[in-house]
């Protein structure tokens, strides 16, 4: 906890983001969520003092998970492969592409002071899919803009980190929101 505020890692994986958060803040991640038992087992090994939820992020109730504690930082690393140009021309999965909406759920229910979402740069082109499950080029960015608008409507000031992160030869960007 940072000054009594929880740190939450959604889509926690093996714990890389949690380790980075801990190194940057000097505080341990309090809650980690991931649907994959192997990822949660690795996260538990790397972060034994964290409360772990091995569940779909949509199945975890933010209010219950936080148990009345305020949230200082909510971190989100939703699956990026359905946005990445590295994926190629394969059809996209609407449900996977929609995982980022869980950040708005947390924003609306527990009002984290800071929300950070990490994804590939193509995330900004998030838009509807056609019947063949391919992005509709003329509607690129529409869903992303709705997502950002919803966070703004919830009282968050949105921005993007000035520098891009390079990971496995793919550029990633951090989108952040701070409560006004």
Predicted segments, located by residue:
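Extreme N-terminal starter segment of soluble prokaryotic enzymes
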Residues: 2-7
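A short, Lys/Arg-enriched amphipathic alpha-helix followed by its capping loop at the start of a domain
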Residues: 20-28, 46
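The conserved SAM/SAH-binding core of class I Rossmann-like methyltransferase domains
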Residues: 33
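Class I S-adenosyl-L-methionine
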Residues: 62-73, 80-180
């Amino acid at each position: 906890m940072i000054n009594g505020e929880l740190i939450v890692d959604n889509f926690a994986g093996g714990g890389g983001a949690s380790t980075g958060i801990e190194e940057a803040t000097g505080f341990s991640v309090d809650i980690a969520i991931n649907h994959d038992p192997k990822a949660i087992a690795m996260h538990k090994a790397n972060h034994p003092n964290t409360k772990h939820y091995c569940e779909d992020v949509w199945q975890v109730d933010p209010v219950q998970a936080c148990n009345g504690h305020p949230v200082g930082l909510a971190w989100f690393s939703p699956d990026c492969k359905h946005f990445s140009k590295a994926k190629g021309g394969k059809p996209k999965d609407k449900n996977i592409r929609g995982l980022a909406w869980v950040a708005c759920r947390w924003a609306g229910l527990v009002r984290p002071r800071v929300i950070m979402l990490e994804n590939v740069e193509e995330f900004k082109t998030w838009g509807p899919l056609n019947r063949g499950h391919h992005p509709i080029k003329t509607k690129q960015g529409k869903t992303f803009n709705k997502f950002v608008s919803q966070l703004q409507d919830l009282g968050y000031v949105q921005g993007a980190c000035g520098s891009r992160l390079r990971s496995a030869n793919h550029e990633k960007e951090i989108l952040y929101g701070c409560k006004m």
